[in-house]
Amino acid sequence: MLFLHFLFLDVVLGGSITENVVQENISFYVMQISSYANKSWVQNHGSGWLDELQTHGWDSESDKIIFLHTWSRGNFSNEELEDLQLLFHAYFSGLALRIQHQPSQLEVKYPFEVQARAGCELHSGEHTKGFIHAAVNGLNFLSYQNKSLVPSPEGGTRAQKFCDLFNTYEGIRETVYYLIRDTCPRFLLGLLDAGKMDLQRQVRPEVWLSSSPNLEPGRLLLACHVSGFYPKPIWVMWMRGAQEQLETKQGDILPHADGTWYLRVTLDVAAREAAGLSCRVRHSSLRDQDIILYWGHGLSVILITFAVIVPLVLLIVLMLLYKKRCTYQGIQ
């Protein structure tokens, strides 16, 4: 819900967008996926995210940050960004060396994959909270509390040994603390300020209905398609009058190449009960004007159009044939 966060961002930065502060949280975080095939081979993937919007990538060949938007630099200077770039490079390299040189101490068993997420969350402009979460092969491994790494129960002795090793390096602990408590919040606010024109945009959804036969005879699977909307938060429900149909099933919200979103919401219903159903869509771009499509109305319009146009076309064809015949007889 990025567009809502600007309501309190303006207050934090001393702007004048609104006098009301919306109680919303927003986070910026970096994600890491490192695959270790053996002692000599590792592949790193890195990315940066503003809530659910990817803002940065990581080129593992050149060890450089990829800025995915014109505003992805926030308000940081080139020097600050270069320092962060060097820091990420040192982190990836140092982690790989540590794992390769101390396999027995860390109980390393190849192959394995490390997934990590580190960043900060801004709570309505009041305070920030830093976080680090890491998993190995999909199982929780460690988290961050009070300037220290804390092992997760699922991580076992491996997690305990890794955290004990990390926590002995006071300089690294202070650097991590500074990054998530100072650097990250400043960068987050800079992103929101630099990208507000793009992040605040509102794109109305297009909505249409369809159906497909169900495996069970006499039933239909009704689908409400909502496409091309931005921002991502949206509410879609099958309705009968003012009554929400609790059997409504929502699919995943999928991205389009242009940054907008697509959603499909379905309802399994007896064919004889389909009449009177409608799909209702609420989105910030619509303000208070919900989109409501009634099942069967579109079909009725098509049938009416078909019933009017087809006889008209046939009549025109018959008139042309009759005229042609009369002309031919006149020549004879």
From Swiss-Prot:
PANTHER family: MHC CLASS I-RELATED, T-CELL SURFACE GLYCOPROTEIN CD1C
Domain Ig-like: 205-292
UniProt cross-references to InterPro entries, sorted A to Z: Ig-like_dom, Ig-like_dom_sf, Ig-like_fold, Ig_C1-set, MHC_class-I_related, MHC_I-like_Ag-recog, MHC_I-like_Ag-recog_sf, MHC_I/II-like_Ag-recog
Keywords associated with the record: Adaptive immunity, Cell membrane, Disulfide bond, Endosome, Glycoprotein, Immunity, Immunoglobulin domain, Membrane, Signal, Transmembrane, Transmembrane helix
Protein name: T-cell surface glycoprotein CD1c1
Topological domain ranges for the Extracellular compartment: 18-300
Glycosites: N25, N38, N75, N146
A biological process term (GO) from this entry: adaptive immune response
UniProt cross-references to Pfam families, sorted A to Z: C1-set, MHC_I_3
